[in-house]
């Protein structure tokens, strides 16, 4: 399964590990993804999403109904 946030679309980024001697090797910066269940009152059921910590804050701010409506408008839910 891809390491992608279902709400924000955050994906792994690519960068460098830099040693004290300034040697560089490739590395990946992974998003902080968590599986979370959200109770959707309007549908009277739980919805399980794989979301980043930034998406959790977005859901707290806008509400799960608003976020799900946005996902459905994009055709992802």
Swiss-Prot record:
GO terms for molecular function: structural constituent of ribosome. Keywords: Ribonucleoprotein, Ribosomal protein. Coiled coil: none annotated. One of its GO terms (biological process) is translation. SUPFAM superfamilies: L28p-like. Transmembrane segments: none annotated. It comes from the Bacteria. One of its GO terms (cellular component) is cytosolic large ribosomal subunit. Belongs to the bacterial ribosomal protein bL28 family. This is Large ribosomal subunit protein bL28. It comes from Delftia acidovorans (strain DSM 14801 / SPH-1).
């Amino acid at each position: 399964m891809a390491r992608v946030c279902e709400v924000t679309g955050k994906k792994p980024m690519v960068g460098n590990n830099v040693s004290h001697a300034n040697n560089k090797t490739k590395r990946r910066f992974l998003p902080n993804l968590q599986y979370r269940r959200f109770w959707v009152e309007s549908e009277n059921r739980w919805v399980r999403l794989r979301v980043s910590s930034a998406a959790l804050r977005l859901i707290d701010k806008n509400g799960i109904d608003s976020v799900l409506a946005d996902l459905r408008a994009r055709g992802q839910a």
